[in-house]
Amino acid sequence: MTNIRKTHPLMKIVNNAFIDLPTPSNISSWWNFGSLLGLCLITQILTGLFLAMHYTPDTTTAFSSITHICRDVNYGWVIRYLHANGASMFFICLYAHVGRGLYYGSYTFQETWNIGVVLLFTVMATAFVGYVLPWGQMSFWGATVITNLMSAIPYIGTTLVEWVWGGFSVDKATLTRFFAFHFILPFIILALAMVHLLFLHETGSNNPMGIPSDMDKIPFHPYYTIKDILGALLLISALLTLTLFAPDLLGDPDNYTPANPLSTPAHIKPEWYFLFAYAILRSIPNKLGGVLALLLSILILMLIPMLHTSKQRSMMFRPFSQFLFWTLVADLLTLTWIGGQPVEHPYVTLGQLASILYFLLILVLMPLTSLIENKLLKW
């Protein structure tokens, strides 16, 4: 008798995606982040659902409802901090996942890569609207500053901003719609993630050497299920440690002050995972230029498959490209640090230099280095 998992219409999909999936035998722990992102998403949806049961999306009660969740709801504080720090874990996994794709040339699976970039944008949008919901000072001013960037769009800018706000400033209408967006977007992310997997399973996984592995495949289960479980345990341990020992480590103290349109915080800055993009935005003195640079800093990922000039797929055997890759990582860490600093000397200049280097590395230096490496190998 044929196994039910191979015949049942629903079980067959699960079987082909997670059990009998032929997988390269040599993929490293860098390939764990896909499953970890799935785990993060499920955690966020579940904790978010329980938070939504107690939250009220109204300017007069939003802040109080968060306080109520933390003080009066059974283990409400755990759920709230798991959700807040879960977002940080989500972005750590996201950036590691994208970095892995860049290093090992996974971007040559163009459909998978482009859906991945769309997913990155959607997760960033979800995190942004979610940060507004507690209605603290940083929530309010963050929403005001970032939505105001749309006013840089010529001709329709101001109208567009007021349309997004639902009025003449960030107010009740804005909070209500942001809550609606924050609730619906994770389910859109879930659907996109399925499309991402669909495209991935059309080609099969890449591997660290970047060479075809059809002659050396192993079943996903048990080899990679057990490996994913180890990764999941490490992620859960890190999340619980952060949540239970230092829940406010990555947050902003200003968000414990209720939103006040009449007093601006000294330093308006987003959560840590947006600081690199914020630094790029601030490093350009022109408003429209800054907005374009901000968008391009992420959209540039879409160009990467077209900028691949090497005859090899992976960077595993390309030391010069490796050096530039780690320079890019260091540059992004520098931008993250600068994004959290006040707008004054020397941070402004450093931010401008780091922003120029970011685009220079991706658009010019890395493709040129790949060509030089081809020449060195007489290819």
UniProtKB/Swiss-Prot annotation:
Record: residues binding a ubiquinone: 201
InterPro entries membership: Cyt_b/b6_C, Cyt_b/b6_C_sf, Cyt_b/b6_N, Cytb/b6-like_sf, Cytochrome_b, Cytochrome_b_C_euk/bac, Cytochrome_b_N_euk/bac, Di-haem_cyt_TM
Cofactor note: Binds 2 heme b groups non-covalently.
Binding-site positions, heme b b566: 97, 196
GO biological process: mitochondrial electron transport, ubiquinol to cytochrome c
Function: Component of the ubiquinol-cytochrome c reductase complex (complex III or cytochrome b-c1 complex) that is part of the mitochondrial respiratory chain. The b-c1 complex mediates electron transfer from ubiquinol to cytochrome c. Contributes to the generation of a proton gradient across the mitochondrial membrane that is then used for ATP synthesis.
Further comment: Heme 1 (or BL or b562) is low-potential and absorbs at about 562 nm, and heme 2 (or BH or b566) is high-potential and absorbs at about 566 nm.
The protein's name: Cytochrome b
Gene source species: Kogia breviceps
Classification of source organism: Eukaryota, Metazoa, Chordata, Craniata, Vertebrata
